[in-house]
């Protein structure tokens, strides 16, 4: 998990991994504590830093499948480009208001995020989740579908959203 931010009250309605008691705590610390409380046998590695062009290749190198749940376009394109360069499969998800989208990239099996969307939109052309709002259940719906993409890839069963963009 890579996140530099702290838990904010506005996060709680859509990021159910955190609680009121976690406000002000580093998101990666709060999320790790919750996951370990649910399953003490899980191993959670956290990195409290922004993903940048300088560190992205190092951050993804040890993982078999990358899940992009970022909330900004520069990060989404950076993760896409790094995964394409490294030959890493990944799942993109995005949510805003009552809408969500999801796609999975597997090298050699379909287009990547940049292939579909070309370039990030101009700064301030699309409102942030904080500006536009997100219905909390949307994060759960899209997050669950994204988790299923990772599970399907890892176990080699089921049809992935490769070459398709699911919109909800």
Task: Locate the predicted segments by residue.
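Adenine nucleotide-associated cytosolic modules
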Residues: 3-168
């Amino acid at each position: 998990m890579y996140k530099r931010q702290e838990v904010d009250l506005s996060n709680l309605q859509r990021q159910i991994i955190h609680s009121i008691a976690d406000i002000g705590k580093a998101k990666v610390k709060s999320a790790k504590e919750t996951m370990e409380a649910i399953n003490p046998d899980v191993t959670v590695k956290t990195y409290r830093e922004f993903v940048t062009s300088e560190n992205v290749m190092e951050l993804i190198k040890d993982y078999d499948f990358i899940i992009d749940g970022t909330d900004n376009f520069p990060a989404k394109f950076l993760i896409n480009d790094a995964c394409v360069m490294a030959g890493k499969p990944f799942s993109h998800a995005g949510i805003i208001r009552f809408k969500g989208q999801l796609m999975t990239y597997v090298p050699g099996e379909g287009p990547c995020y940049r292939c579909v969307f070309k370039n990030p939109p101009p700064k301030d052309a699309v409102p942030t989740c904080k500006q536009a709002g997100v219905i909390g259940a949307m994060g759960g719906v899209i997050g669950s579908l994204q988790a299923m993409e990772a599970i399907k890839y890892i176990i080699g069963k089921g049809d992935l959203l490769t070459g398709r963009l699911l919109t909800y």
